[in-house]
Amino acid sequence: MLRTPLLHEQDCIIGMATPPGTSGVAVLRLSGPGVLSLVVPYLYTPKGEKVAESGFKPRVMRRLNFIDPQAPDVPLDHMLVVHFPNPHSFSGEDMVELHGHGAPVVVKRIMEVLVAHGVRPADPGEFSKRAFFNNKMDLVQAEALMGLIEATSLRAAREASRQMTGTLSEHLMALKDHLVLTYAHLEAALDFSDEDIEPESEGGLLDRLAYVHAGIKKMLGTAELGRQMRDGFELAIVGRPNVGKSSLFNALSGEDRAIVTDLAGTTRDLNESNLEIHGLPILLVDTAGLRESDDPVERIGIERAWQRVERADGIVFVAEAQLGVTLEDKALLQRLPKEKALWVWNKLDQLEGALPECLQDWPEEQICGVSCHTGEGLESVVAHIVARMEQLPEHGEGVVIMQLRQQQTLQQAIVLIEEAQEMLANGQWLELVAEPLTRSIDQLTQLMGNTDYEDVLGMVFSSFCVGK
């Protein structure tokens, strides 16, 4: 589908493709019609010879000097320059990349020179937006690109990279095409109702809608995994005060993030640490000791702890091995969702003999012991966490829904499909069924960006960095 860009997007833009700040290398990216002609006047060979546009071979680096017109005697920078003629570029337009040194003052001056010569500073995500308008990617692929840039784990990066190749887009397009075909059969039933043509039966239309409904439902079933890939698997460490929660938090995070003392109630607020285990990001949360308290500040911390327990993907319940199951432990366990909890007996170094008995109905595979003081058993705790993580499904087809916008749009589409199904099942006029059906098609069209909804496009591309 041809997408029509806004008028201001026909000019030439410049932006940094590398992070700002001092570095060994900085890459400036330019895009727009005839952009090479705007850069060439400032480029010279190492021997001081002027450079012609015809001297550039597509996608071949050239070692050149950038000359500041205000100080032409000394090169402003020595760089590698490459030209990407349209349409064989990231944006689909003529593009030039300047690979120079990462001195902020030099980069700033180069941009000032080029902006004075007719180039405009790029808006956030404008290069990707132009790529979208030039059919180099659809909106789902653009979101996958941003997901790859922001990935905090290998698993999230791999899934985003997979979706950049168009796998998710292909699944969505197949479902949309099936909806369009269903609509065509419905229209045929309306248009040729008086002709000697056998239209699709209402049962056949329902079967087609059921197929699309099941496909979207399957995609929505991956949204929770997508959230965990994007934001991390949240693991809350909970238990009575002074059982070693903060010590375990520090041991797992590999640094002394939480204060550890022998005083009960030391931790009053949440401590967080980002980890990566088996390619999946983990948000580890140390919580306040759970108990009854008259201290108003501690009560706030305890309330926050229970809130995190409710939203956490997994829970590590810590108890003291030498004491066994206390009455306080039993009271806490009544409020904990056992299906997502790991029982950790801490302070093994103070225990003589075997681990104490847990509650009778507690699964054995969800129990382990550790000494945060000596490090004994820490690998076992990590192994149990990994076992919990490995229960998450793998989606090798690249159909994990990782963006909230995608999830919400699919949810709206499925509501409309269900509305059409109900109307058909109740024998309502086909003219009425066509309305929710066309709206569901619009939802899938909007999802991939084949639409003129400028607010949707702005929402997606505004989250990008300038150089993308």
Swiss-Prot record:
Subcellular locations according to the entry: Cytoplasm
Keywords of the record: Cytoplasm, GTP-binding, Hydrolase, Magnesium, Metal-binding, Nucleotide-binding, Potassium, tRNA processing
GO biological process, one term: tRNA methylation
Primary residence: cytoplasm
PROSITE patterns: G_TRME
Pfam families linked to this entry: MMR_HSR1, MnmE_helical, TrmE_N
Cofactor: K(+)
Binding residues annotated for (6S)-5-formyl-5,6,7,8-tetrahydrofolate, in chain numbering: 29, 97, 136, 468
A single cellular component GO annotation: cytoplasm
EC number(s) on file: 3.6.-.-
UniProt remark on cofactor binding: Binds 1 potassium ion per subunit.
Segments passing through the bilayer: none
TrmE-type G domain span: 232-390
GO MF term (any one): GTPase activity
Residues where Mg(2+) binds: 246, 267
Classification via InterPro entries: G_TrmE, GTP-bd, GTP-bd_TrmE_N, GTPase_MnmE, MnmE_dom2, MnmE_helical, P-loop_NTPase, Small_GTP-bd
Annotated positions binding K(+): 242, 261, 263, 266
Binding positions (GTP): 242-247, 261-267, 286-289
Domain of life: Bacteria
UniProt cross-references to NCBIfam families, sorted A to Z: mnmE_trmE_thdF (TIGR00450), PRK05291.1-3 (NF003661), small_GTP (TIGR00231)
Function: Exhibits a very high intrinsic GTPase hydrolysis rate. Involved in the addition of a carboxymethylaminomethyl (cmnm) group at the wobble position (U34) of certain tRNAs, forming tRNA-cmnm(5)s(2)U34.
Family: Belongs to the TRAFAC class TrmE-Era-EngA-EngB-Septin-like GTPase superfamily. TrmE GTPase family.
Subunit structure: Homodimer. Heterotetramer of two MnmE and two MnmG subunits.
HAMAP family: GTPase_MnmE (MF_00379)
Name listed for the protein in its UniProt record: tRNA modification GTPase MnmE
Native organism: Magnetococcus marinus (strain ATCC BAA-1437 / JCM 17883 / MC-1)
Gene that this sequence comes from: mnmE
